[in-house]
Amino acid sequence: MSEPEVPFKVVAQFPYKSDYEDDLNFEKDQEIIVTSVEDAEWYFGEYQDSNGDVIEGIFPKSFVAVQGSEVGKEAESSPNTGSTEQRTIQPEVEQKDLPEPISPETKKETLSGPVPVPAATVPVPAATVPVPAATAVSAQVQHDSSSGNGERKVPMDSPKLKARLSMFNQDITEQVPLPKSTHLDLENIPVKKTIVADAPKYYVPPGIPTNDTSNLERKKSLKENEKKIVPEPINRAQVESGRIETENDQLKKDLPQMSLKERIALLQEQQRLQAAREEELLRKKAKLEQEHERSAVNKNEPYTETEEAEENEKTEPKPEFTPETEHNEEPQMELLAHKEITKTSREADEGTNDIEKEQFLDEYTKENQKVEESQADEARGENVAEESEIGYGHEDREGDNDEEKEEEDSEENRRAALRERMAKLSGASRFGAPVGFNPFGMASGVGNKPSEEPKKKQHKEKEEEEPEQLQELPRAIPVMPFVDPSSNPFFRKSNLSEKNQPTETKTLDPHATTEHEQKQEHGTHAYHNLAAVDNAHPEYSDHDSDEDTDDHEFEDANDGLRKHSMVEQAFQIGNNESENVNSGEKIYPQEPPISHRTAEVSHDIENSSQNTTGNVLPVSSPQTRVARNGSINSLTKSISGENRRKSINEYHDTVSTNSSALTETAQDISMAAPAAPVLSKVSHPEDKVPPHPVPSAPSAPPVPSAPSVPSAPPVPPAPPALSAPSVPPVPPVPPVSSAPPALSAPSIPPVPPTPPAPPAPPAPLALPKHNEVEEHVKSSAPLPPVSEEYHPMPNTAPPLPRAPPVPPATFEFDSEPTATHSHTAPSPPPHQNVTASTPSMMSTQQRVPTSVLSGAEKESRTLPPHVPSLTNRPVDSFHESDTTPKVASIRRSTTHDVGEISNNVKIEFNAQERWWINKSAPPAISNLKLNFLMEIDDHFISKRLHQKWVVRDFYFLFENYSQLRFSLTFNSTSPEKTVTTLQERFPSPVETQSARILDEYAQRFNAKVVEKSHSLINSHIGAKNFVSQIVSEFKDEVIQPIGARTFGATILSYKPEEGIEQLMKSLQKIKPGDILVIRKAKFEAHKKIGKNEIINVGMDSAAPYSSVVTDYDFTKNKFRVIENHEGKIIQNSYKLSHMKSGKLKVFRIVARGYVGW
C-alpha cells in the first residue's frame, strides 16, 4: 500500500508510551499530523496537547491508521445515503406531480406494477441497499412527462424499467422462506453437495446406490428413500458458530469426560497390570527352578556324610583342591536357601492384592541384587568358583563382577542354578554316587547340609579374615590346558588385591594409626592445623593469645573462661608489679613436674602475670592440643582434668601471694627512711616497660583491687612507730604538715610529724600516699632532685597521672563498676589538692591505665571546681588534650564501624581551651576525623547581684544518628573560673522508628526531590554535589547531609557478597526520591562483543557517589537514577547483579523531628 503524500493525518489505534526522548507518546484516538516518513516502520509527526503545546517525535506505524482511508470510506458511503434520501423523498414527488400530466395509459401501466411502499415506513440501512440507479431514472422520466415533453428517453412500458422497479419496490424486511421438507425424486433431481469441507465434520447426504442388479431392487430402494425425509443442507457458518450440532458433536458428548488425573490413574493401572503379568511369568519360571533345585538337594542329602568322610581322607594327598572343596559349596547353598525363602514368601503372598505384588517384586529384585553382591564378594577370596565355571558356558560372565550386580533377569539366575546342579551331579560319581559325566573336567565338592545360619556366620567370619586369606590360600590350577589363567577375571582381581594388600596390612594394628588416618583426624576441624603451628612456635603464645582463644575455646570452654576471669582479676596487680617484687615467681618452679607441656604452662602463666596483655588462654591451648591427639593416655590425663585445675589453683595462690607481697613492699617503700634511693631504683626497670599495654586495659580491671582495701585498716597504726626514722631524711615536711592531717582525718589520727605514712594503707590504689608525696615534693626546698626521684612513683600507684588536670564534671559518663567508686570514696579530699600539682608530674605520667584513674576522676567530679589551680596550668591543659589516645586507637582499629567510634566518643574538657568560647568543634571529636553535624544553643539566665549566666549546649549528630550533648554553664563575666560541664549520649532512633513514619516523610519530601531533579536534567552545574544542593533547599525542615554520604534514615544496605535474595523486602520499600550512595564500587558491564567493561563508582572517599532514585526496576533488577556526570545532570541506571565490590546504601530524607531536633 502506497503512503499518502505528507503531510497527512493519522489516528492512534492504541496508546503508545516510550522512555526514549525522541519518541512521541500519545493516547488512543489521538489525531497526529505526519510530517515525514522515517522508514517502512516509523513516522515522524506532531500534535497539540491540551495545554496548546506542540509535541513532536517518531512513532511506529502499527499504532496508528491513516485518516484518509476512513475519509474514503465515508465518501463511498455518502452516495448511498444520498440515494436513500432521494428515494425517501421521491414517492412524495410522484404522488403530487404525476396525476395531472400523466395519460391514462401511463397511469394504468404504473398501477399495474407493484405498489411502492413509502420510505418513511420502511427503514432501509445504507449498507444493505445497493445504489438505486433505476429510481433516479424513473424520477427523470416523470419530470419529463410533467414538463410536457413528449420525448422520453426510456419508455415506461419497457421490460427493463419494470424489472428495475420491481427489484427495489419489494419489502426487504420480509425474509426469504426456507425450503420446506419435501419428497425429492432422486432419479430426476440430482443431489448437490453444498459443503466443500472435511467430510467427517459436515453432513454429506447418502449417495445413490450403484450396486442394484435389477430395476426392481432400484425401485424398491427408491420407495424406501421416498419415505425418508432428506434433511436440509447445512451451512458451514452455522456449524462453526455452534448453532447446529453435527454427528461428531453428538459423539463427543456421548463420550465420558475424563480429567488429567483420571487419565494418569488409568495409565498407571495399565502399567500395574502389565507389571503383574510380567511378575506372573517370573513366578512361573522361579517355581520351575525351585522344583529342580529341590530335587537336586534331596538327591544329594543321603550322600553328605560319606562325602564328607571321603573328602577328609582325600584332602591330604591333594592339597591343591582343599580350598575348592571347602568354599565351592557356599555360594551354591546360599543361593538355594535364598530361593527357598523367596518361594515360601511368594506362596504366602499369592493372595495379596496387586499393590502388595508390586512391593514384593521390588523386594525380590533387591534380594537378588544382595545375593549377587555377596556371591561377587566371596568370589574375590575364593578361587574354586572360577574353575567350576571355566569349561561350561563361562562366556556370559567374562566381564567384570559389576555386571552381575546390574543383571536382574531371572533367566540368568536360572542358568546359574542349572550349572550348579550339573556340577553337583557330575561330582557325585567320585564319592560313591551313580557315575555321571563331569563336563568341567575337574573335581567339584559336594555341599553340606542346606542350613542357612551356619553358612552366614562363616561368611561373616571369612569377610573379616579375607585380607589374610587372600595371601595364604594357594591358587587353584586350571585342569583344562587350553585355559589361560590370566584371562580369568577372578584371577586378575585377586592379583590386584594382592598388590594393594601390603598397604592395607599396615593398618591392622589397632593401636597404631596411619598417616592418612591422622590427616583425616586433623582434618575434622581447621583449628587443629592452627594448634600445630602454635606448638611449633610456643614463644608466640602470649602475642597470639586471641587466636588461641578461638582455636581451643570449643575444647574446654569452662576452664578457659575460669582462667581468663582469674587473670583479669589479677591484671591490675600485674600492672603494679615491678622487678623488685619477684618473690611470687619462685612459687612456679615448685609445682610437680607433670610433663614438658605443664612446665610451659607455668611459664606462660608467669609471663601473663608480668605482661600487661595478660591473656591466660595460651595456658589451655597446649593442653587441648595434646588431648586432641589421643595417642598417649597418660599425658592427656596429666594435662587435662585434675592436674590442670591444680595448676590453676596454684596460679591463683601465686596471684594472691603476689598481691600480699606487693602491699608489703609498698609499705616498706613508703615507711623506710631512705625512701628516695628506693624509688630511684624502682624507676629504672619501669622505664624499660613498653607503654603499649596502656590502651588494652580500660574497663574492668579496677574491680579486683577491691579485696586489697580491707587490708588497709591494720596498717595505719604502724606509722607512729616508724615516725622516728622517717622524719630525719625529710626536714622540709613540717611546714606543709598542716594540710595532710586534715585530709587523712577520716582514716588516720592527726599526726603532724609523719605525713608520708597515711598514704600507705591502700596498696593497690595508693592514691593518698602519692598525693601527699606530691605535696611534699612541691613544698620542699630541693624541688628538682626530689621530683626526679619520685617521678616513677606512678608505677606503684598508677591512678594519679590523669587525676591532676581533670576538672570536676568531665568524666561523667565513664562506664566503670560501682565497686571501684565505693572503695575509692574516702579519698576525695586529697584530689582537691592534687589539682595543684606541678606540670612536670603530669607530663611524666601519661602512661598510666585509664581504667584505674577513672575511679579517681569519678571522685573529683563530685567536688566544686578549684579555681586557683586552673590559672597555673596552661601546660597541663595541653597535655590533657593530648590524652585521648584511647579513643584514637579505637578509631584506628575500627575504621569502618562508625557506630562503635561514635558511641565511644568522650570530650575531656579543659577550661583553658577556647573552643567552647569560640563555638567550634572540640579537638576530642575533630581529631577523630568523624563526620558529624554540630548545632549550638545558648540560653541566658539572669541572677541576682547583676550576674548573667550562660547555658551553652553543643549537639553533635553522628552518621548513625546517635547524639552527644555537651552542656556548659558559666558566668559570662568570668567563664574560665565558673564553668561546669555535663555530657549526655543519646542512641540512634532508627530502630525505634516505624515504617509508617518513613512513609510519611516520603510523601512530604520525596516528590519535591524528584520534581527538582527532573527540572535539572541536561543542565550543567559543574563539580557541585547534586544531591546536597537539592536537600539544602529544605534546610529548615530536614536534617542536612552528614559528610556528603549520609542523607537520612537507611532503607537499604548492600554488599555484593551478601546476595540479592535477602534484600527483597528492603528493595520493596524503595520509593522515587530516595538517595542512592555508592562507595568504592566496581560494576562489570556485560557486552555482547568484546571484553566486559569495568566501571568504578564512588572511588573518592571524601565525597562518595550520590544520586536521586527515580525507580527500581524489579524485572531488570536495577536502579534508575538522576546523577551528576562530569558536571552534567543525566539519567542513568545501575544493576545490582553487575556490582562486584564496594558498598551501596539507599537513604530517605527525614525531618528534624526524627532525632528530636
Curated annotation (Swiss-Prot):
Composition bias, Acidic residues: 398-411, 544-558
Record's subcellular location: Cytoplasm, Cytoskeleton, Actin patch
Keywords from the named record: Coiled coil, Cytoplasm, Cytoskeleton, Isopeptide bond, Phosphoprotein, SH3 domain, Ubl conjugation
Glycyl lysine isopeptide (Lys-Gly) (interchain with G-Cter in ubiquitin) crosslink residues: 1012
Compositional bias per record (Basic and acidic residues), positions renumbered to this chain: 93-110, 242-256, 284-296, 312-383, 412-423, 506-524, 597-606, 642-653, 769-778
One Gene Ontology MF term: myosin I binding
Residues passing through the membrane, by range: none
Domain of life of the native organism: Eukaryota
Low complexity biased stretches: 574-585
GO cellular component: actin cortical patch; nucleolus
Modified residues (Phosphoserine): 103, 158, 166, 565, 621, 631, 634, 638, 647, 889
Main location: cytoplasm
Keyword Coiled coil annotated: yes
SMART domains registered for this protein in UniProt: SH3
Region (Disordered) residue spans: 68-116, 135-156, 231-256, 284-888
Coiled coil ranges: 234-301, 356-430
Compositional bias of kind Pro residues: 691-738, 747-765, 795-808
Any GO BP: actin cytoskeleton organization
Domain SH3 per the UniProt entry, residue ranges: 5-69
Bias (Polar residues): 77-89, 138-149, 607-641, 654-668, 832-853
Pfam families noted in UniProt: AIM3_BBC1_C, SH3_1
Annotated positions of the Phosphothreonine modification: 636, 850, 894-895
Biological function: Involved in the regulation of actin cytoskeleton.
Quaternary structure and partners: Binds to the SH3 domains of the type I myosins MYO3 and MYO5.
Protein known as: Myosin tail region-interacting protein MTI1
Organism encoding this protein: Saccharomyces cerevisiae (strain ATCC 204508 / S288c) (Baker's yeast)
The organism's taxonomic lineage, starting at the top: Eukaryota, Fungi, Dikarya, Ascomycota, Saccharomycotina
Gene assigned in the entry: BBC1
